[in-house]
């Protein structure tokens, strides 16, 4: 397609030319139909390089923009920024979600400082709308420079396998989708741009229209799986059949976060012990971000706890992971949405307080009868409290384990935790689903007033 457009006929033809950018919008909207906005807006002798539109996704209104890499490599011009800003403005006025489809090599350098102002305005819009209407970013091609910051300002970022997401190119990392998944910048990696748009739709349908709307309700099927011991198995056995969408699977691999439905209503699911008994800094950051996103849209958070605590080796301490641990605690404590916890295995010390403790996290906390809840790991507690009994033992390891088992049964069982008021009830595996559904229903009217302040000063 020629970059130069001189007549109205050429303008109309150019605006309707089939492109990947236009096709991606047909993937997004119901029946591939949408109403285009500012179709003839131009930057000099060419179109603005972005298609902006509104339509319906699963029957609900959505605004979207899709960058067109065939026009000046999708470079952001002042004209393109104005089109995108209009989408954000309309979304703010109407309380409607925004989907941004990114495919651009960055700003148009010929615009000079105008491009900087344009990006600044768009970043202001995404910031102002954060937590007000859902924002989903789809990285379908190259997303470079300030555009990468714009995409990462969304609630969730989905990326195609062959796409790139970077602020500055790095030959060593290669700016790949795989890297974006591993460092947590992309929540989902898909085979191609069409699959990425479909994944964005799947996430979007689980979110409310805005922060004042209720979570969507759907007809649902009961789960077909028995409750297992792994994070994914528990989520799929408790939530509605085929409703679980895991997010950030490659980042913070000891933890599990997912959107799902429970009794037809959206819930956020957090689980530990996906691959490791202890949570890393990445796990803490991942869970904190997810909990804050759910809280922004009043999505109930269900946390399945089975962890020995936080990883605290020399490398972790040197990294300053305590900041991420504090961030996790802060995210749960600050959240006013419904918070439910089920201790399915081990829950020791700070991890119990952060994830399942009634003082800061859970409105209601339950435990399986096999749960072990303790301020210290039983082995550590025995070393500290019963050290004299270990003296002279022929087999020190066996003696320590015997005392630890006894300590767990007598001092750290679910029954002891219930007597001490640490959990609200002891349930069996086959009771988890119904208990959670009943709890969400009875807590639907939850209201909490916070102390007046500009914002909390969470560790970032």
Give names to the regions the model predicted.
Residues 1-460:
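Ligand-binding clefts of soluble mixed alpha/beta catalytic domains
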């Amino acid at each position: 397609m020629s970059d130069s457009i001189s007549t109205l006929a050429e303008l109309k033809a150019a605006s309707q030319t089939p492109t990947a950018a236009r096709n991606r919008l047909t993937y997004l909207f119901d029946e591939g139909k949408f109403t285009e906005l500012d179709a003839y807006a131009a930057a000099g002798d060419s179109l603005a390089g972005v298609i902006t539109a509104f339509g319906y996704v699963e029957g609900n209104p959505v605004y979207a923009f899709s960058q067109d890499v065939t026009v000046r490599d999708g470079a952001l011009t002042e004209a393109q920024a104005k089109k995108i800003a209009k989408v954000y403005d309309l979304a703010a006025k109407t309380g409607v979600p925004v989907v941004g489809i990114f495919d651009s090599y960055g700003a148009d350098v010929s615009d000079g400082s105008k491009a900087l102002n344009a990006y600044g305005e768009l970043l202001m819009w995404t910031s102002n709308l954060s937590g007000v209407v859902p924002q989903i970013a789809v990285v379908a091609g190259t997303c470079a420079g300030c555009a990468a910051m714009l995409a990462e300002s969304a609630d969730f970022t989905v990326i195609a396998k062959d796409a790139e997401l970077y602020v500055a190119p790095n030959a060593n990392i290669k700016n790949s989708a795989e890297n974006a998944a591993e460092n947590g910048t992309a929540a989902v990696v898909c085979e191609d741009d069409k699959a990425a748009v479909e994944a964005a739709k799947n996430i979007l349908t689980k979110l409310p229209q805005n922060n004042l709307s209720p979570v969507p309700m759907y007809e649902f099927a009961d789960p077909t799986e028995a409750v297992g011991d792994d994070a994914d198995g528990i989520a799929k056995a408790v939530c509605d059949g085929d409703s679980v969408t895991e997010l950030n699977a490659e980042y913070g691999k000891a933890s599990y976060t997912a959107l799902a439905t429970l009794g037809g209503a959206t819930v956020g699911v957090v689980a530990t012990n996906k691959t490791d008994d202890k949570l890393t800094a990445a796990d803490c950051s991942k869970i904190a971000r997810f909990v804050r996103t759910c809280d922004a849209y009043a999505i109930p958070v269900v946390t399945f706890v089975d962890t020995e605590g936080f990883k605290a080796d020399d490398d972790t301490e040197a990294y300053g992971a305590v900041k991420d641990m504090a961030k996790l605690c802060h995210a749960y404590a600050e959240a006013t949405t419904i918070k439910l916890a089920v201790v399915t295995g081990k829950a020791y010390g700070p991890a119990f307080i952060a994830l399942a403790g009634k003082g800061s996290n859970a409105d209601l906390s339950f435990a399986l009868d096999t749960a072990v809840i303790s301020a210290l790991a039983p082995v550590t507690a025995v070393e500290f409290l019963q050290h004299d009994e270990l003296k002279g033992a022929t087999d020190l390891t066996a003696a320590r384990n015997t005392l630890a088992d006894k300590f767990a049964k007598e001092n750290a069982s679910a029954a002891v935790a219930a007597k001490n008021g640490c959990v609200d009830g002891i349930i069996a595996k086959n009771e988890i689903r119904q208990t959670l559904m009943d709890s969400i229903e009875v807590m639907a009217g939850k209201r909490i007033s916070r102390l007046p302040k500009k914002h909390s000063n969470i560790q970032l």
